[in-house]
């Protein structure tokens, strides 16, 4: 009986680690969805890049990546978000 419990525990642990591994590998930005937005505007000097969430997500969002690599979900209709997107699209002058 104890062998059956141990076997069940090992099987459960294996399945869980497989699931977590898949979630980690699949965490590129195109598969990231946002479930809440940041309430405060980011300082412009922190922003490095942006991307939109996938169409398969339940709500649209703009994900800004900071210079430190942090990803921040923002509402795409906020004026400051639209301004930052516009600034990031503009080619930089040398």
From Swiss-Prot:
Residues 1-23 form the signal peptide. One of its GO terms (biological process) is monocyte chemotaxis. Disulfide bonds join 33-57, 34-73. CDD domains: Chemokine_CC (cd00272). Ubiquitously expressed at low levels in various tissues including heart and ovary. Gene3D superfamilies: 2.40.50.40. GO terms for cellular component: extracellular space. PROSITE patterns: SMALL_CYTOKINES_CC. Pfam families: IL8 (PF00048). It is found in: Secreted. Coiled coil: none annotated. InterPro entries: Chemokine_b/g/d, Chemokine_CC_CS, Chemokine_IL8-like_dom, Interleukin_8-like_sf. Monomer. Belongs to the intercrine beta (chemokine CC) family. This is C-C motif chemokine 26.
């Amino acid at each position: 009986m104890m062998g059956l419990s141990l076997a069940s525990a090992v099987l459960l642990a294996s399945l869980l680690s497989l699931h977590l591994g898949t979630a980690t590998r699949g965490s590129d930005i195109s598969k990231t969805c946002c479930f809440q937005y940041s309430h405060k505007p980011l300082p412009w000097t922190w922003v490095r890049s942006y991307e939109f969430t996938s169409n398969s997500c339940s709500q649209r969002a703009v994900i800004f990546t900071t210079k430190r690599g942090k990803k921040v979900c923002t509402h795409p209709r906020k004026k400051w978000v639209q301004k930052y997107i516009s600034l990031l699209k503009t080619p930089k002058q040398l």
